[in-house]
Amino acid sequence: GGIRTALINYIIIQQSKKQNSKSKFLLRIEDTDKKRSNDQFKKNILEGLQWLNINHDDSIVIQSERLKRHQEIAHELLKNHGAFKCICSQSILEKKREYNKKNKISIKRLCEICEENNEVQLLTEGFVVRIKITNSQETTIEDIVQGKVTVKNEEIDNFILLRKDGSPTYMLSVVVDDFDMGVNLIIRG
């Protein structure tokens, strides 16, 4: 994000409030990446908004405080076969990337479903949880700026939802929180 993104969001919400009193300007601190997050970043965000006299409508949501909710959704996806456990190391993934590039394979997915045959490795070495994307379909979203955007699923990576330590990635946390917060308009910086 940034102050420009906050201003755009704030202006859009203020206009929307004139037509629909249910619109809210929400503030969420997305701090699931501990290496890139610290208290000073949060302080800077709050001070910047205060300096501009921009007030959020509800309590601040801190993503790292919603760890259990994010893990719950990942485990639900595992249970319902919408995700899988992956034991691939970075070196294995790099070899797959090189192979795909050399052989001009367009499928972005580097990690196939590997949990069935590797139960011992899952227990001893740990695993990440990845989203399971099926090749045979397309995904379409409606974007305010670009209109209808359709992507072949084979071009979407089986991205990580939970890291080896069980912590959620941004890709999981942001979607769960958007859903739980009732977000229906997203403008990101």
Please give the residue ranges for each predicted region.
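N-terminal Rossmann-like or analogous alpha/beta NTP/dinucleotide-binding catalytic cores
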Residues: 1-102
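Active-site cores that bind ATP or allylic diphosphates and position pyrophosphate for catalysis
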Residues: 63, 79-189
